Amino acid sequence: YDELHCHVRAKLGDVYGEDNVPQDGPIPAHLLGNMWSQQWGTLYDLMEPYPGVGDIDVDATLKAKDFSPKEMVRSAESFYASLGMPRLPDTFWERSQFSRPQDREVDCYASAWGMDGGNDVRIKMCINQTYDELRVIYHELGHNYYQRAYKDQPPLFQGAAHDGFHEAIGDAIVLSI
């Protein structure tokens, strides 16, 4: 991470000048896509590792293979399982919302839920076949796996020590896809 940070800071210093991006300090957040420095995708043109080679079109692949929303979630579950984490419980698959219901209005903003402080974890999304949505799925499952990791703790400890840690888990996993 330190090397990546140093590389990005140096490139930004070349573009914006060392007065704006000091080489011995943090990268100014407003140069990293949003004020929380979460979305570095806006830097891709500057950081592209192999200019001119072209991108992998994940959206087209998802559509060509006709991945359903549930299959997209299963791929994320398989990734977490490959890290030694348990498969999601059957209730997750029965009670989560993966697609927009046709019979009622719903809020489709993606969210993860730990319903009982135990194994009843869920996500609520209206999943489309896009790479961005796939990334959100991996992120939201990060919340669910973290919820399951602390389910056996006393109630006082059944939560993140800091809300940012919940976000960091999903965001760190998303870097792996």
Mark where each language-model region is:
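Cation-handling catalytic/transport regions enriched in His/Asp/Glu
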Residues: 1-177
